[in-house]
């Protein structure tokens, strides 16, 4: 079954989801809505990307549609989500990627336009949260769901393996995260987060994140046992999680890596991966996995206390999971 997808919000994630959909056999984007840009500009931003390069397919416009590789995708510019005519374009599964409509109440407005389900491409305060490979099988038919954050998608599969094999007593995470659109190019006012107002390309910026705590939402046994913070760094893409944790069942670093390899080649194939190469962040650009464990970067102090390092392309890999979750929900048919 191919899920007919609509995208609301054609920013970083919206466009990367769109690009990903052309190599995702179970999803098809049939409509895009963004009230802040015209169709000509949408096509331009889709075609050219400073981080991921030029789109491999031909892109042009035909009236109010974007045409990619001969395929027409309707483009609308409606501000009110309740008035977006998803049904007219056959869009049933809506990826809400504006960053604005992140609660069940706000995102549910899409249902009025004919949507069947809404997948929020961000954490949500009240929508059920799912991470592929971790808890998607608990999906029970909710009309609005969250795909969590890119960092939670990196951390949760890794933590799942550690917890199921060795038992995670507690953990602290630091996400070394590429800068994003919410940050400032030069020092500028940022009333709620003073540090966040400093120039993104000139500073290492400590920041709060709910990504680690969110692991407790997708792995309930770890509620209150994992937390963390982030440091925004002057790179445009690719981030890395540094997880330090205490294990209930002692194991050598080699035994832990063996468990990770088994999971990456087994039940978490396509989601969790690993590398034994001397990689740096740019080597991970375009990697479709949620979490790529850097075997050489991890260390163990003793059998019960260790640090695991795992990379993720916070744009490309995350967008892939958004489509995977969308396809899964469509296949379940609840």
From Swiss-Prot:
UniProt cross-references to InterPro entries, sorted A to Z: GlycerAld/Erythrose_P_DH (IPR020831), GlycerAld_3-P_DH_AS (IPR020830), GlycerAld_3-P_DH_cat (IPR020829), GlycerAld_3-P_DH_NAD(P)-bd (IPR020828), Glyceraldehyde-3-P_DH_1 (IPR006424), NAD(P)-bd_dom_sf (IPR036291)
BP GO annotations: glucose metabolic process; glycolytic process
Binding-site residues for NAD(+), renumbered to this chain: 12-13, 34, 121, 314
Stored PROSITE patterns: GAPDH
Catalyses which reaction(s): D-glyceraldehyde 3-phosphate + phosphate + NAD(+) = (2R)-3-phospho-glyceroyl phosphate + NADH + H(+)
EC numbers for this chain: 1.2.1.12
Site (described: Activates thiol group during catalysis): 177
Molecular functions (GO terms): glyceraldehyde-3-phosphate dehydrogenase (NAD+) (phosphorylating) activity; NAD binding; NADP binding
Active site positions, chain numbering: 150
Disruption phenotype: Does not affect the biosynthesis of heptelidic acid.
SUPFAM superfamilies referenced in this protein's UniProt entry, alphabetically: Glyceraldehyde-3-phosphate dehydrogenase-like, C-terminal domain, NAD(P)-binding Rossmann-fold domains
Classification via PANTHER family: GLYCERALDEHYDE 3-PHOSPHATE DEHYDROGENASE, GLYCERALDEHYDE-3-PHOSPHATE DEHYDROGENASE-RELATED
Subunit structure as annotated in this protein's UniProt entry: Homotetramer.
Function statement: Glyceraldehyde-3-phosphate dehydrogenase; part of the gene cluster that mediates the biosynthesis of heptelidic acid (HA), a sesquiterpene lactone that acts as an inhibitor of glyceraldehyde-3-phosphatedehydrogenase (GAPDH) and a growth inhibitor of the salt-tolerant lactic acid bacteria in soy sauce brewing. The GAPDPH hepG/gdpB shows much higher resistance to HA than the GAPDH gpdA located outside of the cluster, but it does not seem to act in self-resistance.
Family recorded in the similarity comment: Belongs to the glyceraldehyde-3-phosphate dehydrogenase family.
Listed name of the protein: Glyceraldehyde-3-phosphate dehydrogenase B
């Amino acid at each position: 079954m191919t899920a007919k997808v609509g995208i609301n919000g054609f920013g970083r994630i919206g466009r990367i989801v769109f690009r990903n959909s052309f190599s995702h056999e179970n999803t098809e984007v049939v409509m895009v809505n963004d009230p802040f840009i015209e169709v000509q500009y949408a096509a331009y931003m889709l075609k050219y990307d400073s981080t991921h390069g030029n789109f491999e397919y031909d892109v042009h416009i035909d009236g109010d549609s974007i045409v990619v590789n001969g395929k027409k995708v309707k483009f609308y510019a409606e501000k009110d989500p309740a008035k977006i005519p998803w049904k007219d374009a056959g869009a049933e599964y809506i990826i809400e990627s504006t960053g604005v409509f992140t609660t069940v109440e706000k995102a549910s407005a899409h249902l009025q336009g004919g949507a069947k389900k809404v997948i929020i491409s961000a954490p949500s305060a009240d929508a059920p949260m799912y991470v592929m490979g971790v808890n998607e099988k608990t999906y029970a038919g909710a009309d609005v769901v969250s795909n969590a954050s890119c960092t939670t998608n990196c951390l949760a599969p890794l933590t799942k393996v550690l917890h199921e094999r060795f038992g995670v007593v507690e953990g602290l995470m630091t996400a070394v995260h590429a800068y994003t659109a919410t940050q400032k190019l030069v020092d500028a006012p940022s009333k709620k987060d003073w540090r966040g107002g400093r120039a993104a390309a000139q500073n290492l910026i400590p920041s709060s994140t709910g990504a680690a705590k969110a692991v407790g939402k997708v792995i309930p046994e770890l509620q209150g046992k994992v937390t963390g913070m982030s440091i925004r760094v002057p790179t445009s893409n690719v981030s890395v999680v540094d997880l330090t944790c205490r294990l209930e069942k002692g194991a050598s670093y080699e035994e832990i890596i063996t468990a990770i390899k088994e999971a990456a080649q087994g039940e978490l194939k396509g989601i969790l991966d690993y590398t034994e190469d001397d990689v740096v962040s740019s080597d991970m650009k375009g990697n479709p996995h949620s979490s790529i464990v850097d075997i050489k970067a991890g260390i163990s102090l003793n059998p019960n206390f260790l640090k695991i390092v795992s990379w993720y392309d916070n744009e490309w890999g995350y967008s892939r999971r958004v489509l995977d979750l969308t396809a899964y929900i469509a296949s379940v048919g609840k």
